[in-house]
Amino acid sequence: MDNILQAEHISKSFTGHKALNDVSLSIPRGSVYGLLGPNGAGKTTFIRIVNRITAPDSGSVLLDGRPITDDDVRRIGYLPEERGLYKKMKVGEQAIFFARLNGLARSEARRQLKLWFEKFGIESWWDRKVEELSKGMAQKVQFIITVLHRPSLLIFDEPFSGFDPVNAQLLKEEILALRDRGATVIFSTHNMSSVEEICDHITLINKSHNILSGAVDEIRRRHGENIFEVSYRGDEAAARGCVASRCQIMEPPTPASEQPSDCARLLLRPCEGVEVREVIAALNGAVELRGFTEVIPSMNDIFIRAVNGTL
C-alpha cells in the first residue's frame, strides 16, 4: 500500500505523563484516516508532532518515505480544535494573509478565495471583522484558509464542533471531495457516526497506546458478535419456537411501533455448533422468511468496547 505518512514508535512524555507510548501507524495516500480516542488519549499530541509543533522523545515521522522536515509542513493544512483567527482583522484580509504565508501569490489567493466564498455562500463576509462572526461562521472561514493552498495532507481536529447539521454535512461533502481530488485527510473526532460516513481507515489511541487500527469496514466485520437480524411474516410463536433450541433469542432491534407493518423481526445468536443454514432452514419451515442479515457493530459500539477492554 502507498502510504503518505508513517509514524514509527512515537513516544512523548510531559512532566511525568506519558502522552504517547510507542505509537506506530501508516496512513494510505488518498484516504480519510480517522484518529480516534477518548479525551487525553494522546491524539492532539500526535497531531502536533506531525506538524512539528513539538518533537517526539523517540521515534520518527516519515512523509513520502523520508523524515519530515520544517519545509514539509507547508504541504500540510492543519485545522486545530482551538481556532486561531485574529478577531480584529477583516475576513478577506486575513484569508489573503494566511494564503500568502502558505506561498500563494496575492492574485491567485484572491481568485481561489472568491471561488470558495461563493461555494460556501459567504461572499458578504469579506469585509466583516472576525469578531462579528459566530463560532460556526468563523469555522467556515478557517476551513477555507486551511485548504486554500491545496496541501497534499490535511489534518482536521474536531472539524464539526460548533456546526449545525446542515453545515456539518456541507463540510463532510467538501472533505470527501478533497480526498477524491487526491488529498489525504487525517480526521480527529469523537463523533463515531461521522467516522462511519467519511473515514476509510482508523487508528484508536487509548491511554497513550495504539489499540486498534485498520480499514473501517474490515474492523466492523471482524468484531461482529455472530448476531443476525431476521425479518419474517407469520406467527411470532412459530418463529421463536423453531429456533429456540438453536439460538439465543435477543431483544428485537426496534420497538414494535417502529417495525414495518408487514414484517416482524427477531435478533438471534446461533448457539455454539449451530450453522446459520440450519437456522434459515428452520425459519423457512415455520414462517415466510423475508430477510436474514448479520448485524455489523457500529463504530460507536466498537469504540466503547475497545476503550473498556471488552473487544
Feature names for model-found ranges:
Residues 2-5, 12-206, 212:
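ABC transporter nucleotide-binding domains
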Residues 8, 26, 231-233:
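Residue-level recognition of well-ordered beta-strand positions that form the cores
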Residues 8-10, 292:
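Generic beta-strand hydrophobic packing signal
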Residues 29, 124, 234, 270-272, ...:
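Non-catalytic surface loops within mature trypsin-like serine protease
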Residues 64, 94, 103, 142, ...:
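A generic structural signal for secondary-structure junctions
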Residues 173-270:
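ABC transporter nucleotide-binding domain
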Residues 271-311:
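C-terminal coupling/interaction segments
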